[in-house]
Amino acid sequence: MLKWALVFFVISLIAGFFGFTGVASGAAAIAKILFYIAVALFLLFLVLGVFAVKSIK
């Protein structure tokens, strides 16, 4: 998912460079949403992993 966020970020930079501000803002918004989803999933799995290790001990 972070890969797609990076792809949309690069698309946003390139579109902004060439003057396509609508495309740039749309791609940046998608990249931001995907990044926050990836961070939320990472934190969720981190917490689940900590609880799993504690339950095994």
From Swiss-Prot:
It comes from the Bacteria. Keywords: Cell membrane, Membrane, Transmembrane, Transmembrane helix. The keyword Transferase does not apply. The chain crosses the membrane at residues 4-24, 33-53. InterPro entries: DUF1328 (IPR009760). It is found in: Cell membrane. NCBIfam families: PRK13682.1-1 (NF010226), PRK13682.2-5 (NF010234). One of its GO terms (cellular component) is plasma membrane. It comes from Thiobacillus denitrificans (strain ATCC 25259 / T1). The keyword Membrane applies. It holds the Pfam family DUF1328. It is a multi-pass membrane protein. Belongs to the UPF0391 family. This is UPF0391 membrane protein Tbd_2239.
